[in-house]
Amino acid sequence: MSWLHKFFDLFLGESEEDAERETKPAQIPQQQEVHHPEGQLKRLEDPKIYYEYPKGKFRFPVVPDGYKNHDLRRRRTPSDEPKSAPRPSAAPYRERPRNEEEQHTYQAAEPAKKPFKPTNIPSPVYGFNQKPSVKKDVPKKPSETLNEPDKSVKEKVTLLSEEIERERGYPASDTQAHSKIESPFFPDTQFEKQPSGVLNRKDTEHDEALAKRPAEPSGNKVPFESGVQQPEKEEPFFPAEQAEEQTPPEMLTDTAAEGLSDSEVGREEPATAEEEQREQQPEKFEEPVFSAELDEEQTAPESQTEAVSEDEKAKEPSDSPVYNHHENAAEGAESPFVQEEQMDIRQEEPLFTDHEYSSEALAQAETVAKESEEPSESIINNHYDTLGEAQETKIDVQPDSHTELEKTEHMEQGSKSSTATLENRQEIRADKPREASEEPKKRPGVQEKRTEQSASSQKGPSVPFNVMMLKRDTHKQQKAEERRGSYVFPNVALLDVPPAQVQDDTAWIEEQRQLLDLTLKNFNVRANVVHVTQGPSVTRFEVHPEPGVKVNKITNLSDDIKLSLSAKDIRIEAPIPGKNTIGIEVPNRTSKVVDLRQMIRSSAFRTSKSPLTAALGLDISGNPVVIDLKKMPHGLIAGATGSGKSVCINTILVSLLYKADPSEVKVLLIDPKMVELAPYNKIPHLVSPVITDAKAATAALKWVVEEMERRYELFAHSGVRDIDRFNQLTAEHQMGEKLPYLVVIIDELADLMMVAPNDVEESIARIAQKARACGIHLLVATQRPSVDVITGLIKANIPTRIAFSVSSQVDSRTIIDIAGAEKLLGKGDMLFLENGSGKPVRLQGNFVSDREIDRVVSHVRSQMPPTYLFEQEELVRQGSALKEEDELFYEACEFVVEQNSASTSSLQRRFRIGYNRAARLIDMMEAEGMISEAKGSKPREVLITASDLINE
């Protein structure tokens, strides 16, 4: 081929030939060195550099040393193609006749006949270990001359044809390394070796980059459509041979015109390459699924493959960065044939070759490349180095594609049949992609890419990949996720909005104040009202007595003051704790309802961190009162029928549902009345269904006592004193499951005390005495606060008490040890005696309706099903079995078997028991089938042996 070089020197001169000979020695030993500047050749001398990851701990297959010789032999002709010489312009593309371009556009780039389907997943190291049998030393056919419009395109074709040859002849790891380097610059020719997964990825990459571009001329898109459609109509009228005959003069015309705008292409191509690098670099390490779709095309003769690749790269003239990206992004996933049509548009449309614009785009691309280079060091650096080499080499070596053009012109005659075949296959493959509109495909691609990125960012692991998670850490994380996603607390919107209660009682309060002053003056008591506080249900007048006035002088006037004020009832608090005044509480004309919604929204309730927080109501000053069951720790609620006990229990339960997670708080509900607590069935907080049977309630209280003992054994074993410390150690050391708090609520104690007073009192006393530290809290309500129901043992161990309206002072003293509850107004009016407080506080309790309870409970039920710790039927059976079983039963059975006779008198004498117990033992043996029935005065027969007794 030396005559071609001599012939080409007539056009290029001696300086280009010298530059060619300087770069040629570096091209022979290795493939890649032809296409990169000399400053970076050392990086590519050793192919292993492509397999070195930052940590160097990955094991890759060793590439055979002999591949260089084979490469040299197979790629000698392509390696001579690119020469370092001044680059002519890409202007010939704008001068070609459109019909000629349309004819030859359909002659190469033959994708597979099947639609792209990513079916096979490659190994991250070996890729597809398929080595198709391909003729290695097939000389290049003249088909390469069909579509060679530009020298820059010829350079790209050379690179890709070399890459395809290497892929067919050498290990997959080597092919992967070079494909990673070259693919960002030559997306069009990778149809030869990459399936639809790669194409789709590039399509979405370019679409995303295109969507981010602020300004792109709208005029580019209109001719683009027309350019796509017209070749489709004209192609069938030209046979393959005719197209091949027309192509050589066209390519010669291009070659003759290539010397027009060298500097113009030199300005454009760096920007285009940099922007391709910027667009495709983020996806380099996320190569999509490969497939063997193109096996037929890969096994084609080498001449056909090179012709196709050259034809594909001929469709990539050096246009402006914007236009180039636009076309690549729009057509990358459809077929290489559709990309050929873009060349027609570029010939007709004015190209954006302004030097200013190209330099700005280049600067912007370099900035983006530097920023994106930081995350992964060595691999990305190698990639960027290779990209830079490809850019510079493409600018320097482009004139040599002119030589290749002339060479391929002389070889044209031998490739007509193969080119015709490729042409027909292209036509079949390219028809469907052209039918669809390209623009609608761009936007969905961008949207799908953004959706995938957002989904990947959301699904990303919360733990860094280089952090080793221990088993206990994983367990802790799973528990936290379960707690975070398992239970959603009810919304305040489930509660009714209270109606507006606007009432001006200023005149009434002033009138009552004057009447009170007048009454005290009439009874010669030197005292006057100094302050008035209006609450939801009562108004408190603070009376300050003058020095020397006894307090009982005012308290003894209770009935007289009630008479003068015309009040239903008054309560005198003398003195008010912490003040030097006496409080006289007078009922309001109309009471205000305290809704649970305003209590839940109060800062006192929301800021409380305890899961056992419960809202009680408003005090006389209108401030919300919130209690913590951990500090109570047990409560006694008593009052007459209709005074508000059950409503108070409901508000406490609903407050717990708003504050407590089922994994933190468990509730045991005992409702002998059967209807008060029935709405709370099947909530996840329950340890068992709501217990309504008195016998089951007794068994449940015994279970609570056993649970308390079990927890204290755990605490003693762990060396802790309370449940909070135990749960803390459990979370830190993963010793076991956390212990939840257990709240036991008994709605009617009087009924239980009638059924089994001893067992119930004993269980309640034991729970109240020592269950606080193990997280078990007791709430007991009764409507009959008499001494036989609230015994001294129970009252002494329950420090917190809530008294509603009662009928007598005796009942009031039974509940709160002082009088005063008999003067309450009812309907939620209560006296709250807190643990450690000397005097009770008057509160107006919350009100929660049945509709609100149903809404909250239905929400809680929807979160998760309940997990019961026991079933009440099982407890009842266990309790009855314990009662029926006699501790002497087994010994009596042994005695009967040994004596071989059974009688009541013998058992009485042997075990020194009474007749009743002995007769019961005999009856139990008969029921078990151990002895026969009675035979009058004769002793019973024994029906079992000693071995049977042991087996039983």
UniProtKB/Swiss-Prot annotation:
Biased composition (Polar residues): 414-423
Biased composition (Low complexity): 237-250
Localization of this protein: Cytoplasm
Residue ranges with Basic and acidic residues bias: 33-49, 93-104, 134-169, 200-215, 278-287, 310-329, 343-358, 391-413, 424-452
UniProt record similarity statement: Belongs to the FtsK/SpoIIIE/SftA family.
Assembly, per entry: Homohexamer.
Function: Required for the accurate completion of chromosome partitioning, in part by promoting efficient resolution of chromosome dimers, before the formation of the division septum. Binds to DNA in a non-specific manner. Shows ATPase activity. Not required for cytokinesis.
UniProt miscellaneous comment: StfA and SpoIIIE are not functionally redundant. They probably play distinct roles during growth and sporulation.
Stated name of the protein: DNA translocase SftA
Organism: Bacillus subtilis (strain 168)
